[in-house]
Amino acid sequence: MGELRLVGGVLRVLVVVGAVFDVAVLNAGAASADGPVQLKSRLGDVCLDAPSGSWFSPLVINPCNGTDFQRWNLTDDRQVESVAFPGECVNIGNALWARLQPCVNWISQHWTVQPDGLVKSDLDACLTVLGGPDPGTWVSTRWCDPNAPDQQWDSVP
């Protein structure tokens, strides 16, 4: 009977470890086979930048430089995951700015990079530069307008 308890205890540990691993795998999202990209604004030679991994810091544009702060994995489940801050994804945020938050596969983290240049969320909002192409300008989301230059982006390797 002592052996049976040991086996049962080991089995329970394996089940718990397996369940935790499954949850972690589900939340992580799979990176696209194409590798990381930069999201370059059509306003100029400026790219989407995550200068801080803080949830309270806005995403901004800065001159494109190819650093990990400006590189993004477009995951198979349509999340835009930071290379500099793995496990942190672009979130629609609030009315003030877009920001990074833990990748949890919420609808507010589902994005499509469209051929017309829009980076559109499943909530029908698009990434928008809030002003001109000056370094440090905040990026937010607004109603999508395919004619708005501040909503035009290119996905570049």
Curated annotation (Swiss-Prot):
Family matches, as InterPro entries: Ricin_B-like_lectins, Ricin_B_lectin
Residue intervals of the Ricin B-type lectin domain: 33-157
Keywords, ordered alphabetically: Lectin, Membrane, Transmembrane, Transmembrane helix
GO cellular component: extracellular region; membrane
Transmembrane feature ranges: 6-26
GO molecular function: carbohydrate binding
Record organism: Mycobacterium tuberculosis (strain ATCC 25618 / H37Rv)
Name of the protein: Uncharacterized protein Rv1419
